[in-house]
Amino acid sequence: MGKRDRADRDKKKSRKRHYEDEEDDEEDAPGNDPQEAVPSAAGKQVDESGTKVDEYGAKDYRLQMPLKDDHTSRPLWVAPDGHIFLEAFSPVYKYAQDFLVAIAEPVCRPTHVHEYKLTAYSLYAAVSVGLQTSDITEYLRKLSKTGVPDGIMQFIKLCTVSYGKVKLVLKHNRYFVESSHPDVIQHLLQDPVIRECRLRNSEGEATELITETFTSKSAISKTAEGSGGPSTSRVTDPQGKSDIPMDLFDFYEQMDKDEEEEEETQTVSFEVKQEMIEELQKRCIHLEYPLLAEYDFRNDSVNPDINIDLKPTAVLRPYQEKSLRKMFGNGRARSGVIVLPCGAGKSLVGVTAACTVRKRCLVLGNSAVSVEQWKAQFKMWSTIDDSQICRFTSDAKDKPIGCSVAISTYSMLGHTTKRSWEAERVMEWLKTQEWGLMILDEVHTIPAKMFRRVLTIVQAHCKLGLTATLVREDDKIVDLNFLIGPKLYEANWMELQNNGYIAKVQCAEVWCPMSPEFYREYVAIKTKKRILLYTMNPNKFRACQFLIKFHERRNDKIIVFADNVFALKEYAIRLNKPYIYGPTSQGERMQILQNFKHNPKINTIFISKVGDTSFDLPEANVLIQISSHGGSRRQEAQRLGRVLRAKKGMVAEEYNAFFYSLVSQDTQEMAYSTKRQRFLVDQGYSFKVITKLAGMEEEDLAFSTKEEQQQLLQKVLAATDLDAEEEVVAGEFGSRSSQASRRFGTMSSMSGADDTVYMEYHSSRSKAPSKHVHPLFKRFRK
């Protein structure tokens, strides 16, 4: 018996392990497909084997990096491990910053010194927007205070030598592999797989190589406002120009001129079979020549132009214009990702891209609210007629006849179960269309399986990803490089804040001591109910109520965020405020949001995690967070974005928006809060710690007596373990609502006896006399 029991236990364990592995696979971000092809250079790291390390772990770079004589006038130094440090107070800061944003990933950008890191993907992005290997190495040498280490030079050459030399171009609805390097084309054609992909004529012979000369000019014309050099908050002192080494200044001017000039380029191309495109892309990646996707929309005569233009009132800000110039730099549309802070006008960038391409456009958001907002943005900024915009959500399915711009959600397109007849017809129409541009809003949220499904369902010539936070806790964000394209542009948050393009936010972490009764239970309980105890901490409730009262007296508009629905309802109902969460209908949501925007009596609303992204509330200037999703950096930044929109009529020098994160002291929440702040601290924000709110004792606040606090504690303890869990949003990516989850709990909880009380009732025996019953039926009486 013992052997059989052991075998059963082992079988159960292996089944459990297999199940957990499956769960982990589901959580994987883009790129968990084993067939995903990635160039081997993408996995390369900078070699720093020759670096000396002392007994304290400090690295000694003196022998590898001798200082230049005029090092004080040069703004950066490059470490042998690929990290680049930039002096933000240098006279040539603006030139160096523009260059570094193009070639490296920002790591941390506080006030005085910025840190960047060279990666294979950042160098791919640099090549994709037109920078040559020689440009990158030469300008890096000129900007550096020291000699650039040989390992860095080799790394740059390795990552840029082949990338960007071959392009997949769609012209007249035919696919061509194109390059300005004839030797590369000949090298590719020697490969048997690529020869198979090449189009052949009716006699079975390969079509001829096409040699042509074309003039490349940006599709986005530079405005007078945007032409004054790089956009920056730093104003260079004209007298400081003498401090700038001439070789630096001349070289930057030359690079700027090269970008502006119309260039004549001679290219060699061959036509390929459309059905072999995916095979061709994979093979080119294995040969270390990844294909850059470009769309020659001006010469696409097969897909009709749509009647859309920007309104004269739509004025692009310098950073928006710059991001679009990276996308349309050579007169064609490049696929890629643009990173702008929340509230910095990502929607206008998307609408302008659609107006530039002027082909059928598909926009994908992550909620029905974002669909409505994208429709409003198209109507606000462009001349498109309302009848040409078609929405496809669970609530609104517009007829697609004559539609030029379709707006939907990822979950609607990736839906695999049975659809209604009407939805099936719309899906068929979406699949048969050839889309010129696909705009992917909040592109960081998309897991691999769903993302691949969306990409295979609809055919689009150009893909533009928009996001504010290109971070994921699983570090799989880099796979977007080959699913969509490289990062084309990333803005500096502090720079936009200093220029008044986004609000100036005061970030604060408010420490709320746990009441003794709550803390005693918190220490004793080991289940998920601990989350409920530190969220429902009466001192946190009082701090929240005090901040709401304080800001309502200033006529501020306040959003309170809570991931936990039990806490959200308790707070909102007790404070008599409207709240929005998953089950709230679309009509009720829009009504609450409209009241919040326009009704002076509704100054505070409570929102669950459904409002993390795509809720456009420019009036809000105070955000209070009472519970959150663990240590998610992305969620913290997205929530801050709800109050980042520039405020009208406010002085830019003063703080005009406030972000409070309420944290229960001596609990797990403290550690989570520190983790969550990392992304914003790297962007240059600082968090002020408040241990005591001045004037809180004078206010008449809830839970001021021990009896009230005890009643609240009993209510929390009576709640189920399910109440302690975060909200699962229907249709949310990465949500595992359909899967089983493992929870700790008591036996009574598992038997459904959480709120059940055993009670006895003594009923009186004296009953009313029953009616006369026939003797025959008495036998069947129970």
Curated annotation (Swiss-Prot):
Regulation: Phosphorylation on Ser-751 by CK2 controls the 5'-excision activity of ERCC1-XPF endonuclease; phosphorylated protein inhibits the excision activity and thus NER. ATPase activity is stimulated by TFIIH subunit p52 (GTF2H4). DNA translocase activity by this subunit in TFIIH is stimulated by XPA, ERCC5/XPG and XFP plus ERCC1.
Catalysed reaction, written as an equation: Couples ATP hydrolysis with the unwinding of duplex DNA by translocating in the 3'-5' direction; ATP + H2O = ADP + phosphate + H(+)
Record note on modification: Phosphorylation on Ser-751 by CK2 controls the 5'-excision activity of ERCC1-XPF endonuclease; phosphorylated protein inhibits the excision activity and thus NER. Dephosphorylation reactivates the 5'-excision step. Phosphorylation has no effect on transcription or the 3'-5' helicase activity.
Domain named Helicase ATP-binding: residues: 327-488
Keywords recorded for this protein, A-Z: ATP-binding, DNA damage, DNA repair, DNA-binding, Helicase, Hydrolase, Isomerase, Nucleotide-binding, Nucleus, Phosphoprotein, Transcription, Transcription regulation
Record flagged with keyword Flavoprotein: no
Pfam families according to UniProt: ERCC3_RAD25_C (PF16203), Helicase_C_3 (PF13625), ResIII (PF04851)
Role: ATP-dependent 3'-5' DNA helicase/translocase; binds dsDNA rather than ssDNA, unzipping it in a translocase rather than classical helicase activity. Component of the general transcription and DNA repair factor IIH (TFIIH) core complex. When complexed to CDK-activating kinase (CAK), involved in RNA transcription by RNA polymerase II. The ATPase activity of XPB/ERCC3, but not its helicase activity, is required for DNA opening; it may wrap around the damaged DNA wedging it open, causing localized melting and twisting that allows XPD/ERCC2 helicase to anchor.
Subunit structure: Component of the 7-subunit TFIIH core complex composed of XPB/ERCC3, XPD/ERCC2, GTF2H1, GTF2H2, GTF2H3, GTF2H4 and GTF2H5, which is active in NER. The core complex associates with the 3-subunit CDK-activating kinase (CAK) module composed of CCNH/cyclin H, CDK7 and MNAT1 to form the 10-subunit holoenzyme (holo-TFIIH) active in transcription. Interacts with PUF60. Interacts with ATF7IP. Interacts with KAT2A; leading to KAT2A recruitment to promoters and acetylation of histones.
NCBIfam families recorded: rad25
Protein's UniProt name: General transcription and DNA repair factor IIH helicase/translocase subunit XPB
